[in-house]
């Protein structure tokens, strides 16, 4: 192993006797997990006892290392000094419930225990339980370094905020939706220590991973600024997957490479106070120890980046002709997108970074062009609809310059304020109707106000806003650009979870009038294939395909929702890239398209890689005509819709 001292190596290599921590984050789909795994492998190979932890609800460490990992700390085969764990939010929540309740059983009666159990049925418990695991691993003296492969950017920021938020909540004492505060004094100390450690640059390093694309780097800039406000600075930026110069032999890919290099130049000037490392796109997927070692060698040992076409797995020969069009039926796709008799709700979801927002926006423009009154909404905390439309997109539906089309994004702070107002107004009305002079109304309202300061109120507020879009008047179609896969499942499970919690009689959760019935209607609408369509967006590689498939199965099993459409994005154009590198990647894509078709067995929308991402209405119209199957659908073709 060489001893070259790269800037990236200085960031990740431990230099003290205390356990150190390295966090990798970034827009989903940029190779964050690959870089995390490569870093952990490199550290272990250099004799550091290393633990790799993913807090992403859609983990893929098992796929990268080609072995089962799961919720227990697992030794990685053939890598001494390396262990890994994929935190399972469901398992973590149950463990948290049992750890909270068991010490109380000898002290409290059955009625009191039942009250605690009811509190712990709050959906917020899953969030704090996952974080509880996260905090536990920040107190792991048996390791030299703990590498965190964190959830995609918007949710990572939320995770980073949790220590302060829950600490403030526990300061108040009394009862919380995560259990009685008096039982969690030890948690309070843990959270205080976590806050101190996260902001200690001598022990904690924060690294972003991005693709050489403007949207990816824009996201990193925003996230780095948000982290700085929390007192956490980032020290490393890894630009992953740039096109190697040696394989770009035609104007299309020469142009894409030039664009990428311009982005890398921008990164060098914008992030000049941070270490910068780059790694090229390979002809095949990065999995297995040999390729992970290559990534680590380039990033941390200063080895020259190489592209070995022959090293990629290739199941097709150079003589094979790849015809992507055989995998799609445009009419079948269009049938799943247009309304029948009532307002249709379209959900585009998938692993972050697969082009989900672009596909959702493109589909919305095409539907509006066809004459349907359309609203496109993003529920993703890392939203960028405004960048795609080149128009302001706010909390309330507003026009983006296209007839029949409005757009909105959920502003979490405003949603929380709206929810607080809704709850407090209803509480006051409820006590006014009782007209009981023995009740101290202001004290009761003050108690509710305090409960609304809990971090879990943010989750309920986001849900309320999400549900409100099912009540928007005047739209034939509402298109949801949802958060990345694991978090989308959490959002879609919330109506059922919160309804169950509200049935327990919790004042705050049940303060909004008739919420239970409203949630029932939303659940039924999402489960009705004549009114709701769920489309999984992916690029045709193993990890995004499997994450989408697992998520689709979870949707079916946990929420009773069937997948309607799959979207295969970033297909390599057949007219360009006439060499072994792109032939290999194109053949690989065809192989995965076949597997996607077999696994999902639903209509497939195909979207090609473009010279530039479609931005602005003109680009979106052109792109939509090519990919949605809606070209030619107009006023004369569509049925009369009864809008909500």
Swiss-Prot record:
Disruption phenotype: Deletion of the arsADRC operon results in increased sensitivity to arsenite and antimonite but not arsenate.
Induction: By arsenite and antimonite.
Organism placement in taxonomy: Archaea, Methanobacteriati, Methanobacteriota, Stenosarchaea group, Halobacteria
Family per record: Belongs to the arsA ATPase family.
EC number: 7.3.2.7
GO MF term set: ATP binding; ATP hydrolysis activity; ATPase-coupled arsenite transmembrane transporter activity
Reactions that this protein is recorded to catalyse: arsenite(in) + ATP + H2O = arsenite(out) + ADP + phosphate + H(+)
Binding site for ATP: 26-33, 350-357
Annotated TM spans: none
Keywords, sorted A to Z: Arsenical resistance, ATP-binding, Nucleotide-binding, Plasmid, Translocase
Designated name of the protein: Putative arsenical pump-driving ATPase
CDD domains given in the database record: ArsA (cd02035)
Species in which this protein is naturally found: Halobacterium salinarum (strain ATCC 700922 / JCM 11081 / NRC-1)
Gene: arsA
Cross-referenced NCBIfam families: ArsA_halo (NF041417), GET3_arsA_TRC40 (TIGR00345)
């Amino acid at each position: 192993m060489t001893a070259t001292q790269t800037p990236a190596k200085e960031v990740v290599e431990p230099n003290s006797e205390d356990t150190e921590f390295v966090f990798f984050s970034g827009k989903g789909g940029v190779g964050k997990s690959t870089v995390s795994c490569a870093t952990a492998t490199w550290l272990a190979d250099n004799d550091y006892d290393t633990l790799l932890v993913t807090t992403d609800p859609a983990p893929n460490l098992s796929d990268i290392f080609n072995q089962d990992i799961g919720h227990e700390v697992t030794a990685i085969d053939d890598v001494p000094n390396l262990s890994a764990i994929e935190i399972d939010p469901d398992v973590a929540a149950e463990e948290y419930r049992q750890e909270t309740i068991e010490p109380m059983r000898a002290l409290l009666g059955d009625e009191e225990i039942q009250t605690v159990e009811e509190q712990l049925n709050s959906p917020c418990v899953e969030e704090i339980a996952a974080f509880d695991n996260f905090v536990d691993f920040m107190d792991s003296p048996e390791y030299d370094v703990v590498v965190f492969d964190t959830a995609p950017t918007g949710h990572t920021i939320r995770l980073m905020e949790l220590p302060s938020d829950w600490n403030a909540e526990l300061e108040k004492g009394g009862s919380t939706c995560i259990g009685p505060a008096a039982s969690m004094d030890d948690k309070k100390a843990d959270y205080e220590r976590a806050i101190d450690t996260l902001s200690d640059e001598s022990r904690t390093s924060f690294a972003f991973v991005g693709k050489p694309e403007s949207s990816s780097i824009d996201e990193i800039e925003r996230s780095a600024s948000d982290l700085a406000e929390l007192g956490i600075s980032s020290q490393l930026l890894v630009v992953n997957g740039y096109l190697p110069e040696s394989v770009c032999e035609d104007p299309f890919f020469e142009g894409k490479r030039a664009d990428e290099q311009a982005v890398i130049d921008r990164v060098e000037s914008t992030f000049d106070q941070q270490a910068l490392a780059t790694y090229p796109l390979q002809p095949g997927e990065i999995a297995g120890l040999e390729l992970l070692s290559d990534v680590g060698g380039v990033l941390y040992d200063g080895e020259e980046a190489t592209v070995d076409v022959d090293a990629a797995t290739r199941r097709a020969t150079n003589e094979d002709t790849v015809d992507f069009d055989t995998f799609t039926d445009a009419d079948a796709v269009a049938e799943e997108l247009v309304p029948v008799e009532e307002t249709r709700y379209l959900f585009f979801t998938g692993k972050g970074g697969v082009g989900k927002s672009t596909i959702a926006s493109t589909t919305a423009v095409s539907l509006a062009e066809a004459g349907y009154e359309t609203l496109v909404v993003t529920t993703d905390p890392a939203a960028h609809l405004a960048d795609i439309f080149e128009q302001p997109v706010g909390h309330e539906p507003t026009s983006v310059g296209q007839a029949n089309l409005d757009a909105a994004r959920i502003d979490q702070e405003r949603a929380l304020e709206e929810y607080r107002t809704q709850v407090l107004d209803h509480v006051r009305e409820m006590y006014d109707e009782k007209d009981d002079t023995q009740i101290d109304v202001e004290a009761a309202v003050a108690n509710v106000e305090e409960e609304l300061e809990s971090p879990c109120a943010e989750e309920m507020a986001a849900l309320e806003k999400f549900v409100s879009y099912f009540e928007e008047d005047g739209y034939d179609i509402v298109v949801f650009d949802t958060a990345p896969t694991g978090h989308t499942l959490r959002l879609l499970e919330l109506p059922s979870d919160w309804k169950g919690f509200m049935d327990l009689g919790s004042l705050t959760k049940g303060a909004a009038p008739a919420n239970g019935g409203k949630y029932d209607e939303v659940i039924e609408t999402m489960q009705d294939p004549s009114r709701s369509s769920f489309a999984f967006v992916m690029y045709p590689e193993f990890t995004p395909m499997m994450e989408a498939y697992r998520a689709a199965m979870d949707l079916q099993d946990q929420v009773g929702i069937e997948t309607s459409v799959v979207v295969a994005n970033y297909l390599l154009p057949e007219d360009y890239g006439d060499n072994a590198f792109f032939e290999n990647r194109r053949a690989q894509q065809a192989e995965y398209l076949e597997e996607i078709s077999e696994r999902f067995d639903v209509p497939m929308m195909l979207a090609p890689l473009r010279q530039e991402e479609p931005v602005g209405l003109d680009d979106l119209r052109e792109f939509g005509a090519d990919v949605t199957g809606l070209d030619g659908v107009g006023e004369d073709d569509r049925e009369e819709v009864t809008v909500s």
